[in-house]
Amino acid sequence: PAEVNKLLQAALDTNADVIIGSRFLNREGFQTSFVRRLGIKYFHWLNRILTHKSIHDTTSGFRLLGIRAIKLAAAYYPDDYPEPESLIFFSRAGLTIKEVPVVMRKRQGGKSSIAGFSTLFYMTKVTLSSILSYVRKI
């Protein structure tokens, strides 16, 4: 609950349309593997090129969406691996995006759908989808 409150407080303080709970701003809590961090840094770089915004945790699904973002997401939210791609169309639509530091814990169960050979597929798919979101009419 404390981490959710950080997102709610940021929304009240900033009136941002999208609030992202970021693992990497304060580097507290679970930080994921080195290889996964490289992938996240790649999507940070790609997002920065396409949107001119520096969002450090582009793969975080811990988000709070305001009404404008919800309306846009209802029409355009990707089915597969939506986190990096959605930031591009939120940015293109002129929505305000804010990151706040949160503490996340390691996965308690289950397995990531992105492991082994599927990592290459994921990176390729999200890169192409992000570029298409950049040129797509919103």
Predicted regions and their residues:
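A C-terminal cap/extension of S-adenosyl-L-methionine-dependent methyltransferases
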Residues: R92, S113, R136
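Catalytic donor-sugar/metal-binding loop of nucleotide-sugar-dependent glycosyltransferases
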Residues: K53-S54, A75-P78, L87-R105
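C-terminal, non-catalytic tails of nucleotide-sugar-dependent glycosyltransferases
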Residues: K125-I138
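Acceptor/aglycone-binding surface of glycosyltransferases and processive sugar-polymer synthases
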Residues: P1-D80, R107-T124, L128
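DNA-recognition element of transcription regulators
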Residues: P84
